[in-house]
């Protein structure tokens, strides 16, 4: 019985270590080690992009988009396994941190940049 309990406890410990833990006070600039989590589930947040000269490159991948209203200031926070994105103006998304869900209210505004679009900039 003790062996089964310890085995289950070990499995739970492995799952917890791969999740974000602890409290995160409201911030527009989460730490580098948290960017993968926050930018995976809402990629339109401004802290997920490096924007220069009208183009934005996603910090976690090779996606390049035209700079527009798609890139939006976000405030993120975490408290008791609740993760929250706040886009201002009453637009927010709350999810269980260990069961995240993609959310992107600005998806329609995303305009990927391609080489043949370069004359449009």
Swiss-Prot record:
**At which residues is glycosylation annotated?**
62, 116
Where does the signal peptide begin and end?
A: 1-20
UniProt keywords (A-Z) are: Early protein, Glycoprotein, Signal
Which InterPro entries does the record match to this protein?
Answer: ASFV_fam_110 (IPR004848)
The record's induction entry says:
Expressed in the early phase of the viral replicative cycle.
Taxonomically, the superkingdom here is: Viruses
Q: According to its UniProt record, which protein family does this protein belong to? A: Belongs to the asfivirus MGF 110 family.
Q: What protein am I looking at?
A: Protein MGF 110-5L
Which species is this record about? African swine fever virus (isolate Portugal/Lis 57/1957) (ASFV)
């Amino acid at each position: 019985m003790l062996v089964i309990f310890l085995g289950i406890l070990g499995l739970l410990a492995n799952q917890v270590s791969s999740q974000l833990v602890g409290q995160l006070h409201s911030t527009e600039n989460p730490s580098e080690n948290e960017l993968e989590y926050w930018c995976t589930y809402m990629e339109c947040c401004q802290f997920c992009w490096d924007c220069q000269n009208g183009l934005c490159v996603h910090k976690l991948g090779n996606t390049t988009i035209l700079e527009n209203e798609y890139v939006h200031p976000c405030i993120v926070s975490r408290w008791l396994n609740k993760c929250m994105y706040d886009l201002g103006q009453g637009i927010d998304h709350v999810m269980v941190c260990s069961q995240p869900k993609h959310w992107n209210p600005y998806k329609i505004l995303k305009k990927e940049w391609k080489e043949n679009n370069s004359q449009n900039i």
